[in-house]
From Swiss-Prot:
Gene expressing this chain: ydiR
A GO term, aspect molecular function: type II site-specific deoxyribonuclease activity
Highest rank taxon of the organism: Bacteria
Induction text: Constitutively expressed during exponential growth. Encoded in an operon with ydiS and ydjA.
Phenotype reported upon loss of the gene: Not essential; its disruption results in increased transformation by plasmid DNA carrying multiple BsuMI target sequences. Triple deletion ydiO-ydiP-ydiS leads to loss of susceptibility to MspJI, which only digests C-methylated DNA.
Catalytic activity line of the entry: Endonucleolytic cleavage of DNA to give specific double-stranded fragments with terminal 5'-phosphates
Alphabetic keyword roster: Endonuclease, Hydrolase, Nuclease, Restriction system
Chloroplast as UniProt keyword: no
Signal peptide location: none
Subunit structure, as described in the record: BsuMI restriction activity requires YdiR, YdiS and YdjA.
Designated name of the protein: Type II restriction enzyme BsuMI component YdiR
EC number from the UniProt entry: 3.1.21.4
Organism for this UniProt entry: Bacillus subtilis (strain 168)
Function as written in the Swiss-Prot or TrEMBL entry: A P subtype restriction enzyme that recognizes the double-stranded sequence 5'-CTCGAG-3'; the cleavage site is unknown.
């Protein structure tokens, strides 16, 4: 069975288990694809990173450098770009446009220009929503990695190959770049705290445009449900994407110790991807895009329960 056929079979299984495809919130949906790529290219599964984006190719900027991949050197990345299907007469032109855009967005993750997040090879695929056929777009590869290059040409005959030299920088340049990136990340000021119900619906958001946060910062927040009651949470900043800052719950005051009553929080690896795909206005800094009721309206908070540095805004 050919490499592409194995990928198509795995992607068909993925769609069967996760009808939302690349927008699914599952963190394990790509496991079989990762295994196939690992076996085909003769590298470890931990050296293969698989991701995807729905409709917006520019989101690969976020996908390649998210979570544990940030500032990490990994052997290979695989990206699926999912878009609505088109008539056969438009297919060739669409593939060309998608390929060019995907290469432009992805190349900096291969040549070493993107914040230290780097891959020796990047496989780009096009898929149509709800369909299982996989269209190879291009393979981006570090010019000195002859093993990956030869394997790609063997496994996907005729694939467009893009070779890149690795950008060389002095330690001083690297330090300056790191400092600049840290400043850029800390300058984000649009903060969104996302809570998720058991059914996956988002029930609350709070935004604060007067503060800036870094990953790892701890935040105290109170969510008022009526004139006298509130739910107080300790939050940790776990991701900064564009103007979006996402926090994970660390502790919750004045609620029963019952896991069924606790709010479910966004999983940064995949749920954030789906959230951004489903709510594109978040990336434009829009306000008021989420509303709903707070879980446990009977929760009460007294001033004695709050930490000393808590600010009730």
């Amino acid at each position: 069975m050919t490499f592409i056929k194995r990928l198509e079979d795995a992607y068909e299984t993925l769609l069967g288990n996760y009808p939302a495809g690349v927008s699914s919130t599952s963190t394990s949906k790509y496991n079989e694809i990762r295994k196939i790529v690992s076996e085909a290219f003769l590298i470890g599964e931990n050296e293969v990173y698989v991701t995807g984006t729905s409709r917006r190719i520019s989101n690969l900027d976020t996908r390649f450098a998210q979570g544990n991949q940030r500032n990490k050197h990994t052997r290979m990345a695989v990206a699926f770009i999912s878009i609505p299907s088109v008539d056969d007469s438009e297919l060739d032109e669409l593939i060309i446009r998608t390929r060019n855009s995907a290469i432009t967005t992805s190349s900096k993750f291969c040549n070493g220009e993107e914040r230290g997040t780097i891959f020796d090879g990047i496989l780009l695929f096009l898929v149509f929503e709800g369909e299982t056929k996989v269209y190879p777009l291009a393979f981006l590869v570090f010019e000195n990695d002859f093993e990956l290059k030869e394997k790609a040409e063997e496994l996907i005959p005729g694939i467009e190959l893009k070779e890149y030299p690795r950008a060389n920088q002095s330690p001083a340049q690297e330090n300056n770049k790191s400092a600049k990136n840290e400043d850029e990340e800390s300058a984000k000021s649009y903060v969104v705290f996302l809570d998720i119900e058991e059914d996956g619906s988002i029930v609350e958001f709070v935004e604060d445009k007067d503060k800036t946060y870094r990953i790892g910062d701890m935040i105290w927040t109170a969510s008022h449900t009526n004139g006298s009651s509130a739910i107080t949470r300790r939050l940790e900043v776990i991701e900064v994407v564009e103007n979006l800052v996402v926090c994970k719950i660390k502790h919750k005051y004045n609620e029963p110790v019952d896991k069924n009553s606790l709010l479910k929080f966004v999983n940064i690896e995949q749920d954030l991807i789906s959230f951004l795909d489903l709510h594109p206005n978040v990336q434009n800094g829009s306000e008021g895009f989420v509303s709903g009721d707070i879980v446990d309206e009977n929760a009460t908070t007294s001033s004695d329960d709050l930490p000393e540095d808590f600010e009730n805004n």
